[in-house]
Amino acid sequence: MSHIAKIYTDKDTTLDPMKGKKIAVLGYGSQGRAWALNLRDSGLQVTVGLEREGKSWEQAKADGFTPKKTEDAVKDADVVIFLVPDMAQRLVYRERVQPYLREGMDLVFAHGFNIHYRLIEPPSNVDVYMVAPKGPGPIVRDFYVKGGGVPVLVAVHQNHSGKALEKALAIAKALGGTRAGAIETTFKEETETDLIGEQTILVGGVMELMKAAFETLVEMGYQPEVAYFETINELKMIVDLIYDKGFMGMLRAVSDTAKYGGFTVGKQVINEETRRRLREAAEKVRSGKFAEEWIEEYGRGSPTLSKGLEEMDKSLEEQTGRRLKEIIERGRPKS
């Protein structure tokens, strides 16, 4: 049975565990930039570590940092934060981080994949913990600048110092996360629920449901442009209502016809067979089979992923959406 999560806010946390520590943020993409800026603006000492000079290097310089090569940033650091892509982390750790680890250093992750599936196995004399913002980097930064914060998950994998949770919460606070709330979890729970959510709903399930509805309408003779609005474009408005006001708030905002159709037909579309398949997908993640499959796929150059992206780029859904973009943008209110 599920238990009630422990949630920490600003009043429960302090920046003290991170004060005076040299923090190396590895990567300067969406999350890396937001983390580096927020931590620095919270008064912490931040260095950006990058593999090579390029756009990210120049962006970091433009933002007032003096970026270093990854290994140089790690050599000087007390805290190393991994914000490079998941599948690049193992190589970065092995070649750029592991040779320079010292007792008492901290390794920080924003997603548990590499630790949970043992792609990275740190020595026992360092702290290993996670701070995972539940939003994309630009939102993490925007909310922070405006005085708010994106909720975060925090977890501890190794607690050599005895203070790993306090340090995780200090970073969460510096990111702005405890302005909303930091939810305590585990690497296992964060990794598995993140992957299950992505596959069954956020990327896989929702996209395939939209495609199936769109293609069904087109096959029945309806115009692709009309089908696109009804099955794809309007989803954002419904999700925004749920995000802002919950399911009941959304239901109060739609017509009685929509409510009745949703309650009666929705359960026919998402039925027990669908739930069985959801459980199968979840078990594949929990067992580690998905991770094994993805690691093998990545090692072969990601042919399945490349094929999927190519097919989507050429799909009628995507082509219709591009044609309608001008109409959609023309009607968007000017800020």
Swiss-Prot record:
UniProt: Mg(2+) 1 binding residues: D194, E198
Binding-site residues, NADP(+): Y28, G29, S30, Q31, R52, S56, D86, M87, A88, Q89, G137
Documented EC number(s): 1.1.1.383
Binding site for substrate: S255
Functional description taken from the UniProt entry: Involved in the biosynthesis of branched-chain amino acids (BCAA). Catalyzes an alkyl-migration followed by a ketol-acid reduction of (S)-2-acetolactate (S2AL) to yield (R)-2,3-dihydroxy-isovalerate. In the isomerase reaction, S2AL is rearranged via a Mg-dependent methyl migration to produce 3-hydroxy-3-methyl-2-ketobutyrate (HMKB). In the reductase reaction, this 2-ketoacid undergoes a metal-dependent reduction by NADPH or NADH to yield (R)-2,3-dihydroxy-isovalerate.
Family (UniProt): Belongs to the ketol-acid reductoisomerase family.
Protein name: Ketol-acid reductoisomerase (NAD(P)(+))
Organism: Metallosphaera sedula (strain ATCC 51363 / DSM 5348 / JCM 9185 / NBRC 15509 / TH2)
Encoding gene per record: ilvC
